[in-house]
From Swiss-Prot:
Residues 274-287 have a biased composition (Low complexity). The lineage of its organism: Eukaryota, Metazoa, Chordata, Craniata, Vertebrata. Residues 208-219, 255-271, 342-352 have a biased composition (Basic and acidic residues). One of its GO terms (cellular component) is cytoplasm. Residues 376-386 have a biased composition (Acidic residues). Pfam families: BSD. Residues 297-322, 356-375 have a biased composition (Polar residues). Residues 146-198 form the BSD domain. This is BSD domain-containing protein 1-A. Gene3D superfamilies: BSD domain. Residues 208-228, 255-386 are annotated as: Disordered.
């Protein structure tokens, strides 16, 4: 009895196991068949729509020109071939391909509409079974934080719309719920994937805007380039000008003023020659005047420090008279001493020597001082204003002391 009961138990267990395995295998096989059928249908539909849209676009752009020969035949044959393909695969113009699985949408006018990147990625997410079967990507903490704000009651309208408008979501929902996943897990995973896709699109848009702003900021306009070029060209020039600006000379200069025109008009018979002055190292004009009334005249006072003026006058009788050598030697010595002193210590007050056209004598004038040149010229005129009696007295004195002067003159020579 015990052995019969054990054998019946084993047979019933094996039969039940076989039945359950067979049922599960049949269900799995049926599920795989449906997936393969749907996949083949989608691929066939996508291929047909893509070929039809491409053929229509190429046919519209290809224009047969009025040329002759082989080129015209080739273009016409290609146009006919594309027309046949378009007529075979394209739907009628009054129907629109209502399909969410392609990126090209046919319109009644025969044109196509392209999906953007966001729509294409959303379709790929909706038609991928891994979106609903696998755990969400990323950190689990982020998914848990998102679940804290998840409310399926607020998503009922959106869920109903997705089941109506999206065949891929409707097919996957029918297959997977409740066999593979629960109703709540199916929609939680889907909407979290959509949430991640939206975040990714937001980051992509932010990066694109930042790149556009950086490109616009790095591209200078023509006006900015010209301003930079002008500024770069003018700055070194200004620096060079500031560097090489010559300051006003600090060394005093000597000015020689010669009233030659007035002298030539007033004294046409006068002959003038120039002799360098030892003290001031300037040129002072000396005028020699032929006058029979004056034999010789020497100034009793020195006109200016370091200068020597000698005037020779010849009488009409033809007598050659020379001035006393002793005073001349003393003056020469004084002038040499003053010249050495002035070379060691340059004078701070520079004088300008002018040729006086009225008296024929060189008169010093202070540069920048009022009344100095006029006073000195008047003193000189007073010194040279001699009467005839004074001249005769001077001549007699010279004749009396002629011997002494001759000896002094020889010594001086």
């Amino acid at each position: 009895m015990a052995e019969g009961e054990d054998g019946s138990w084993w047979r019933s267990w094996l039969q039940q196991s076989y039945t359950s395995v067979r049922d599960k295998s049949a269900e799995t096989l049926e599920f795989m068949k449906r997936d393969l059928t749907e996949f083949s249908r989608v691929v066939h539909h996508d291929t047909a729509c893509t070929i039809a849209a491409t053929a229509s676009v190429v046919k519209e752009k290809l224009v047969v020109e009025g040329s002759s020969g082989t080129t015209e035949k080739v273009k016409k044959g290609l146009s006919d071939f594309l027309g046949v393909i378009s007529d075979t695969f394209a739907p009628s113009p009054d129907k629109t391909i209502d399909c969410d699985v392609i990126t090209l949408m046919a319109t009644p006018s025969g044109t196509t509409e392209l999906y953007d990147g966001t729509k294409a990625r959303l379709y790929s997410l909706q038609s991928d079974p891994a979106t609903y079967c696998n755990e969400p990507d990323g950190f689990p903490a982020e998914f848990d934080a998102w679940l804290a704000y998840w409310d399926p009651e607020q998503r009922k309208a959106e869920i109903s719309e997705l089941l109506v408008t999206s065949p891929s979501i409707r097919a996957l929902f029918t297959k997977m719920v409740p066999a593979a996943v629960s109703h709540s897990e199916f929609w939680q995973r889907y909407f979290y994937k959509v949430h991640q896709l939206e975040q990714e699109e937001a980051r992509r848009d932010a990066l694109k805007q930042r790149a556009d702003q950086s490109v616009h900021s790095e591209e200078p306009t023509w006006e900015e380039e010209e301003e930079d070029f002008v500024g770069a060209g003018s700055a070194p020039a200004l620096k060079l000008e500031e560097k090489y600006v010559l300051s006003t000379p600090t060394i005093p200069t000597l000015h020689v003023e010669d009233k030659s025109e007035k002298t030539a008009e007033l004294n046409r018979d006068h002959t003038s020659f120039t002799s360098p002055s030892e003290s001031s190292e300037s040129i002072s004009p000396i005028t020699q005047i032929a006058n029979p009334e004056y034999i010789e005249q020497t100034p009793s006072k020195e006109p200016s420090p370091g200068t020597l003026t000698v005037t020779k006058e010849n009488t009409g009788a033809g007598t050659d008279e020379t001035s006393a050598p002793a005073p001349l030697e003393q003056k020469t010595g004084k002038s040499n001493t003053q010249m050495a002193t002035q070379r060691e210590d340059p004078p701070s007050d520079l004088r300008v020597f002018e040729l006086n056209s009225d008296s024929g004598k060189s008169t010093p004038s202070n540069n920048g001082q009022k009344g100095s040149s006029t006073d000195i010229s008047e003193d000189w005129e007073k010194e040279f204003d001699m009467t005839e009696e004074e001249v005769q007295l001077a001549l007699s004195t010279v004749e009396v002391s002629g011997e002494v002067e001759d000896e002094d003159w020889e010594n001086w020579e």
